[in-house]
Amino acid sequence: MKNNLKVKLEELVIYILKNIKRYPNIIQRLKFYEQIHLGLTLNKIKNKREIYYNSVSIFKKQSIVDMLIKDTCNKLKCTQSDLLISTTLKGVFYGNITFYKNNKLVHVNLKGTSLIPDMNQIDRIEYTQKKCLIIEKDTIFSKTVREYISNDILFICGKGYPCRNTLLLVNKLNIRKYGIFDFDPYGLEICTKYPSIKKIGIDIKDINLIDKQHFMILNKYDIRKINTLLKQKVYEIELFYMLKNNIKIEIEGLFSAKGFDINNYFYTKII
């Protein structure tokens, strides 16, 4: 497969050089093809960011690399992983979990927070947890894994909008999934990106626990996003509440509330 792709890539380069006037970004293309060809030759996997940072002065922007990846996959009729380009890793997890590829151990995490490995290289995972808690924000994730006492929960953080790699891991988990997100339209939209998840916070009942100094008013972008989500008919109760009260709240407001007990909060929410 790799040798076949190398041949196709070489043929593509020849074609582009013969039709150079049709490709104004020829320098960027040739540099990109060079990196891909080298990766296929050495059987070395790279992610999008590595490709970009190897030639920042040529590519100028990450979006150029993203466009070239998509264009090359279309032209060669292959996938990103066929080109040995891995997904840029962003999400993290906390908990005992083992990852396998072709029955060979690829990654194991026994203690501490770890970056989710490239799930395109994983075909089997093993875990003992019965539940999964997905946390929107990295700061809240760090506080939760430090202070929340539980051995049967796997913690995952997508650091905002989850990347495809994070979603691939979540999809492989055959356990109950819960999530906590900001009480704003973007937090709710992020929640919709996760399949089969039960949102446990911030919910409207939690607002009574939060000091009003943490209440923020909606801006025009929030209102625009709310209207977009309402058209999708998701979380309508929360969205109408935000509009009616002109309010949004970050998770930090809940966690800093007077008398807030993180163990009691999650114990009553995660069942």
Swiss-Prot record:
Gene3D superfamilies hit by this protein: 3.40.1360.10, Winged helix-like DNA-binding domain superfamily/Winged helix DNA-binding domain
Gene Ontology cellular component annotations, sorted alphabetically: nuclear chromosome
Topo IIA-type catalytic domain residues are 1-92
Q: Which UniProt keywords apply?
A: DNA-binding, Isomerase, Magnesium, Meiosis, Metal-binding, Nucleus, Sporulation, Topoisomerase
Query: Which cofactor(s) are needed, names only?
Result: Mg(2+)
Xref: SUPFAM superfamilies? DNA topoisomerase IV, alpha subunit
Intrachain S-S bonds: none
Instruction: Report the active site residues.
Output: 53
Q: Which residues bind Mg(2+)?
A: 136, 182
Q: Could you tell me what this protein does?
A: Required for meiotic recombination. Mediates DNA cleavage that forms the double-strand breaks (DSB) that initiate meiotic recombination.
By sequence similarity, the record places it as follows: Belongs to the TOP6A family.
The protein here is known as: Probable meiosis-specific protein SPO11 homolog
The protein's organism comes out as Vairimorpha ceranae (strain BRL01)
